[in-house]
C-alpha cells in the first residue's frame, strides 16, 4: 500500500491495493487514514457497484438517498451524480432530474440536511470531464482550529 499526502491539511492518495479484495488489516489502515486525513483518493480502481457498496458497508450502515430520480434502479445505495442515465443516454437539461443535479454544483456537504448526517461519501468517477466537474473538499476541523478564540466562543 503506497500512501501519498495530497495537502498539508487534507487528503491522501492510496495506490497498490485492490478495493474489491481487501483483507481486514488493510481496511483498518484505510479507515485510520480516512479518520486522520478526511479524504482518500484511490486512483485507477475499476470497481462494480456491488464492490462499491460492499466497501462502503465496511464503514457502517449505508444511506439510501431520498431522491428517486438519481438513485440506481439496481442498487438503491448508489446515487448517480451524472448527466447520463443508467442506459447511457444523456439527460436533457430541461428534465427535472437534470435541474436537481445542477443544484449539487453549489458548495454543499452531502446529507447535511438529514437529522443524522452521514459520516462520509464515496465518489466513484467512471467518466470524468477534463474541464469543470470539480469536486472540492474542506477540512472543517482545521477551519475551526484556525478561528480566533472569540469567534469560537460565539459558535
Task: Tell me the role of every PLM-derived stretch.
Residues 1-155:
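Non-heme Fe(II) oxygenase catalytic core, chiefly the N-lobe of the double-stranded beta-helix
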Amino acid at each position: 500500500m503506497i500512501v501519498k499526502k495530497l495537502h498539508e491539511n487534507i487528503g491522501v492518495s492510496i495506490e497498490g491495493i485492490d478495493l474489491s479484495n481487501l483483507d481486514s488489516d488493510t481496511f483498518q489502515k484505510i479507515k485510520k487514514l480516512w479518520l486522520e486525513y478526511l479524504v482518500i483518493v484511490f486512483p485507477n480502481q475499476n470497481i462494480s457497484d456491488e464492490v462499491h457498496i460492499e466497501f462502503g458497508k465496511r464503514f457502517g450502515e449505508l444511506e439510501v438517498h431520498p431522491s428517486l430520480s438519481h438513485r440506481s434502479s439496481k442498487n438503491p445505495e448508489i446515487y448517480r451524480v451524472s448527466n447520463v442515465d443508467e442506459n447511457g443516454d444523456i439527460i436533457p437539461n430541461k428534465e427535472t432530474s437534470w435541474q436537481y443535479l445542477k443544484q449539487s454544483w453549489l458548495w454543499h456537504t452531502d446529507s447535511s440536511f438529514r437529522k443524522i448526517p452521514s459520516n462520509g461519501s464515496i465518489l466513484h468517477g467512471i467518466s470524468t470531464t477534463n474541464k469543470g466537474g470539480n469536486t472540492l473538499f474542506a477540512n472543517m476541523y482545521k477551519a475551526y482550529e484556525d478561528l480566533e478564540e472569540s469567534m469560537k466562543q460565539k459558535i
